[in-house]
Regions:
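An acidic, glycine-rich "communication" segment
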Residues: 328-443
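Ligand-binding face of N-terminal immunoglobulin V-set domains in extracellular IgSF glycoproteins
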Residues: 81-106, 110-117, 122-185
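Proline/serine/threonine-rich low-complexity linkers at boundaries of modular beta-sandwich domains
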Residues: 17-79
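Helical hinge/lid and interdomain linker segments adjacent to catalytic or ligand-binding clefts
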Residues: 134-149, 154-158, 164, 250-336
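Active-site rim elements
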Residues: 249-252, 356-367, 470-480
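Structural motif
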Residues: 169, 196, 291-296, 321, ...
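Aromatic-Pro/Gly-enriched surface loop or interdomain linker
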Residues: 104-129, 177-287
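Extracellular low-complexity, Gly/Ser/Thr-rich intrinsically disordered linkers
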Residues: 265-267, 417, 425-498
Length: 498
């Protein structure tokens, strides 16, 4: 492959089926001078190669060669170090890491927990000894489905009982300190909490193009042909495997949204439990035990068991907080993997010539709006202001906002709105908190809306209708105190602080 193509794949952020202006976000253990440009304080996401930036935006001390002691991100062409794990475990449980190292050499694992931690963004929790590394077998390919379930276990992480449940990242570093990669995972808790945060690992896997090598990789959006050309959805995979690394840096494309919310929520002391969407699907967590469920980021792919569990929770009085857009758009199925482990394959037969029937929830007679109060409308080419409405509502209390005022760049990525001809959920109260005009990629005028309703059970259901809400809570360069206050008003009401 050409050098220019290789550089694109190094980022792990090829053009997927969605424009996400926030993506993976900055991570604290990757901070360095080459991530800040000029005197403006503008932060460029850590996964962007400075060599590809205009010279005017590079740091004055930018060196095209990685500094000694500062590893580069592994890529899927060289596969210098890549790994994956099951995705979640319990306190007192264990997690098996399967890692490939090319060329073979020892490597280390550093485990971090995402949180505020006085502004640090994460805390170092554990470090492995040096682990023997080997080149694992090539991924197995069946049709467009790529799986590494046959990789050998490299290292087992024992999770102590005294750790705090949460979102964790295992950082893999080669012994020569030249390359680094990541394995995200979740530590669940047996105890109840006020709020259950559900990390959207089903959607993360739908977008995973591993390996981004110009030949083998496939997601539900893309695949390559024999010429190395990237193909679109009609030729993409219909089934993808959880048993493989994430492309590029080893982190899901949209993971930064969840990390933004976690840092903010833990800073202000909200009582959180953690689980993955696959846990919700499998019934490993009971959402009715919580006052509220938090969906912190892009959460597009839902199975029927996921939706039914959330509907039951709402009808039992559990509030729902959707902090992104394009939620619950596609219906998917989860199946056991080749080794018999449950829920290791994700299937969504969308936009395929041989399967013309739609698998959109709205086309199956269950539009998203029936649960969330609004539903997906379209992509937002460039961030635009959110125009607030009904500012006398308690959600906007203390923000200082008045009807018609704007919150800059808060509508971004994708948007939701209310569809008048689509059934609404039963409610005792309902309000639209924003109505924001924008133009789509064809220049056609559209609008975004933010919704809140109260179910007969007393549950509040909030939907932000934009990708930019979570980043406004704790993303450097994107925070907005009014969004922070509105979110606090919502969660305080759900947690019955008042």
């Amino acid at each position: 492959v050409g050098a220019e193509q290789t550089r694109r794949w190094e980022s792990g952020a090829l053009a997927h089926g969605v424009t996400d202006p926030f993506g993976q976000g900055p991570l604290p253990w990757l901070r360095g001078a080459d991530q800040y440009f000029g005197d403006t304080g503008l932060m460029v996401p850590w996964y962007v190669d400075p060599a590809l930036l205009p010279a005017a935006r590079r740091s004055p001390d930018y060196d095209p060669k990685p500094a000694l002691g500062r590893p580069r991100t592994s890529d899927d062409v060289g596969g210098q170090i890549k790994g994956f794990a099951a995705g979640a475990t319990d306190l007192g449980g264990s997690l098996d890491l399967r890692v490939s190292v090319n060329p073979p050499q020892e490597f280390t694992v550093d485990v971090y927990r995402i949180g505020h931690y006085g502004g640090a963004g994460a805390r170092h929790m554990a470090a492995s000894p040096r682990v023997s590394g080997l080149v694992q077998p090539a991924p197995l390919v069946a049709g467009r489905t790529v799986s590494c379930h046959h990789w050998w276990m490299s290292w087992r992480l024992q999770v102590p009982l005294h750790w705090t449940p949460g979102a964790y990242v295992a950082v893999l570093t080669t012994a020569d300190h030249r390359h680094r990669s990541h394995i995200p995972f979740t530590v669940r808790a047996g105890r109840a909490a006020d709020l259950l945060l559900l990390l959207p690992d089903v959607t993360w896997q739908a977008y995973n193009l591993y390996p981004e090598d110009g030949r083998t990789g496939a997601s539900l959006y893309h695949a390559w042909n024999e010429k190395g050309e990237l193909l679109g959805e009609p030729a993409a995979a219909t089934t993808v495997s959880f048993d493989r690394p994430y492309a590029g840096a080893g982190l899901p494309l949209h993971i930064g949204h969840a990390y933004d919310f976690i840092r903010w929520a833990e800073r202000y002391g909200y009582d959180l439990a953690y689980a993955n969407a696959t846990d919700l699907h499998a019934g490993r967590v009971d959402p009715t035990r919580y006052r509220g469920l938090i969906f912190p980021g892009h959460d597009e792919y839902w199975s029927a068991p996921m939706r039914r569990a959330v509907e039951r929770a709402r009808d039992g009085g559990t509030s729902l907080v959707f902090l992104s857009a394009n939620t619950m758009y596609w219906q998917v199925q989860l199946h056991q993997g080749p080794a018999g482990e449950p829920d290791r394959l994700l299937t969504c037969s969308k936009r395929q010539a041989e399967t013309p029937a739609s698998v959109l929830w709205r086309d199956l007679g269950e539009p998203e709006q029936q649960l969330m109060g609004i539903q997906y409308s379209g992509r937002v080419p460039e961030p635009v202001p959110m125009v607030v409405h009904n500012t006398d509502h308690w959600v906007w209390e203390g923000t200082g906002l008045r009807d018609g005022e704007e919150i800059p760049a808060l509508v971004a990525g994708e948007s939701d709105r209310y569809f008048p001809r689509v059934p609404l959920p039963e409610s005792t109260e309902r309000v639209l908190l924003a109505h924001s005009p924008y133009k789509d990629v064809r220049g056609v005028g559209r609008h975004q809306e933010t919704s809140l309703y109260r179910a007969a059970s007393g549950a509040h259901v909030f939907a932000s209708g934009t990708f930019a809400w979570s980043p406004a809570l704790d993303r450097p360069g994107h925070t907005d105190e009014r969004v922070q206050r509105a979110t606090a008003n919502l969660l305080d009401r759900i947690c019955k602080v008042h």
